[in-house]
Amino acid sequence: SVVKSEDFTLPAYVDRRDYPLPDVAHVKHLSASQKALKEKEKASWSSLSMDEKVELYRIKFKESFAEMNRRSNEWKTVVGTAMFFFGITALIVMWEKRYVYGPLPQTFDKEWVAMQTKRMLDMKVNPIQGLASKWDYEKNEWKK
């Protein structure tokens, strides 16, 4: 029981749009009916029926160009998998916000930010191009 591996030094069959005529036929070992059809192929092609021509094509090629160009539904799997992982990530983030992170510091409150901004304006921080340059100290409001 010796397993014989395929010899990869020989040309292999492949269906590709950019390589339309592979070096070898799709069917390597012909049956008796296929051998008879190959003999009939050597005669005039007008004597062959449409089914025989299709069978000869299928011996040489696995897929036609129309079958190779047919759209696959693989995009649905990709989008579904991406959405699944986005959902898992959203659940993890929600769990972390609820159970891992503490409350926000007081410096994030709107009142605190307003007091800090007022303090910076009173100190005239960065009066040339910064915050203080945009405040009108005479009218006590932001410049327009």
UniProtKB/Swiss-Prot annotation:
Q: Signal peptide span per the entry?
A: none
Query: Which residues are listed as membrane-spanning?
Result: 74-99
Membrane-protein topology: Single-pass membrane protein
Which BP terms in the Gene Ontology apply to this protein? mitochondrial electron transport, cytochrome c to oxygen
Instruction: Write down the SUPFAM superfamilies for this protein, in alphabetical order.
Output: Mitochondrial cytochrome c oxidase subunit IV
What is a single cellular component term in the Gene Ontology annotation?
A: respiratory chain complex IV
What this protein is called in its record is Cytochrome c oxidase subunit 4 isoform 1, mitochondrial
Q: Which organism is it from?
A: Theropithecus gelada
From the broadest rank down, the organism's phylogenetic lineage runs: Eukaryota, Metazoa, Chordata, Craniata, Vertebrata
